[in-house]
Amino acid sequence: MSSELQTEIQEAVEKRRNFAIISHPDAGKTTLTEKLLLYGGAIHQAGAVKARRDQRKATSDWMEMEKQRGISITSTVLQFEYRNFQINLLDTPGHQDFSEDTYRTLAAADNAVMLIDAAKGLEPQTRKLFEVCRLRGLPIFTFINKLDRPTREPLELLDEIEQELGLKTYAVNWPIGTGDRFKGVFDRRHQGIHLFERRAHGSQQAQETAIKLGDPKIEAHLEQELYYQLKEELEILQELGGDLDLKELHDGQITPVFFGSAMTNFGVQLFLEAFLEYALQPEGRNSSVGVVDPTHPEFSGFVFKLQANMDPKHRDRVAFVRVCTGKFEKDMTVSHARTGKTVRLSRPQKLFAQDRESIEEAYGGDVIGLNNPGVFAIGDTIYSGTKLEYEGIPCFSPEIFAYLKNPNPSKFKQFQKGIQELREEGAIQIMYSTDDFKRDPILAAVGQLQFEVVQFRMLSEYGVETNLEPLPYSVARWVTGGWTALEKAGRIFNSMTVKDNWDRPVLLFKNEWNLNQVKADKPELGLSSTAPVGSGINE
């Protein structure tokens, strides 16, 4: 490789920053996402999810059902530039039923932003996703939102993060008042008070005024009580000691904390600028040949998401690929690790929710969209040059099950196509009965909303009305010993044997008690709550 290309790749990687936002539903994730895009210049007016009909719908919530319900139910990728940085924002589903889609997205992220509602503090979904981030060793940034509403005490919120998550905190900025007395934030990095004016309900960039702490002008903007309260709280923070150690941040041991109000733009720009300064740039990833650095000259990447019908006019399928190493170029030919085939990547796209534009090149840390004619699966590795495979993305145990029935035989082809494409993109897990007379697919999900989404999309995207027939099971376990172990075990009571989409045996149980009984009686089965997918499949 020429030294010019090496330098080009090195410089490109240094400019890349990518992150995913994790939160409990209704913490304001979609709003924060849009405000970051607003400050990044990617959009000029933010459309709040719960906005009136005459306002724009949220940019990141592009699927029809998302627009109707005002929730994020599929992950999207939003790319924009800010101050010479190329930012990939991996927007994730906020609803708890879609935690598996969030997990897949976190596999492609280098950093995570933990969004917390200032009135509620840590909530169950946030805790669950935090553990996933910790498992992956991601640096975690914290944005405490909705300071313009009644809140808990800021110091109490910091203490909760430290005590419950075992994560040290460092307040990068500090709120001045809360609720209707919220006046702005104090930036500890530059020792200045930032005062904001609300404008067009936060749909445009906020006008902000920065004043040094000892400036006499402060009296014109802050009540004396708030000013003295701020000084007192800053002294407490100082006494608590500690600085923001970037190594500790990158190792996932400390979280920088930012306060603000995404809806009214308070603190959003301060967060974005500090994030770009502190965040981890793309790093090396584990593979079958060891850790591979993003500046490695040969291109490689992995598929972390598939999406059907992003453009309803063309009924397309797109594979979301995280570029890991080297330089991606349009029309390049790559190897597909799972099948050994070569694939020409002729129509690469830059993604922005459902909007796309053609690209000529991409580097480590970028996310690109590739046309998927049924070749790619979640977890697949593509590469040029030396063969390698990245770690697979696990598939988690579903908790509710139902037969999906097609009452209209004339829609058989559309029904089969819809099931195949929704299964491929990971919208739902599909299983089948081992009884050849029962041909209906079994939907396996972590929550009821996933069933509703599948039925909605089958109708709106494939024109097929469907019926659900619930099954009385709540626990699924893959049989790691395979069909041979299952046959040797003989009859297994209080369970249903099904096969997943790769014909691997799965046992369904009505409850944990039945599961534990089988585990005790037949340990040779090797029951597992997760199964690898994509390149990690044990076929």
UniProtKB/Swiss-Prot annotation:
- Record's GO cellular component terms: cytosol
Q: Where in the cell?
A: Cytoplasm
Q: Which GO terms describe its molecular function?
A: GTP binding; GTPase activity; translation release factor activity, codon nonspecific; translation release factor activity, codon specific
Instruction: Give any Pfam family that matches.
Output: GTP_EFTU
InterPro entries reported for this sequence: EF-G-like_DII, EFG_III/V, G_TR_CS, P-loop_NTPase, PrfC, RF3_C, RF3_dom_3_sf, RF3_GTP-bd
tr-type G domain: which residues?
14-283
Sites where the protein binds GTP: 23-30, 91-95, 145-148
Keyword list (alphabetical) reads: Cytoplasm, GTP-binding, Nucleotide-binding, Protein biosynthesis
Q: Name one GO biological process term.
A: regulation of translational termination
The UniProt similarity line reads:
Belongs to the TRAFAC class translation factor GTPase superfamily. Classic translation factor GTPase family. PrfC subfamily.
The UniProt entry, under NCBIfam families, shows: prfC, PRK00741.1, small_GTP
Q: What's this protein's function?
A: Increases the formation of ribosomal termination complexes and stimulates activities of RF-1 and RF-2. It binds guanine nucleotides and has strong preference for UGA stop codons. It may interact directly with the ribosome. The stimulation of RF-1 and RF-2 is significantly reduced by GTP and GDP, but not by GMP.
Q: What's the protein name?
A: Peptide chain release factor 3
Record the organism: Rippkaea orientalis (strain PCC 8801 / RF-1) (Cyanothece sp. (strain PCC 8801))
Q: Which gene encodes it?
A: prfC
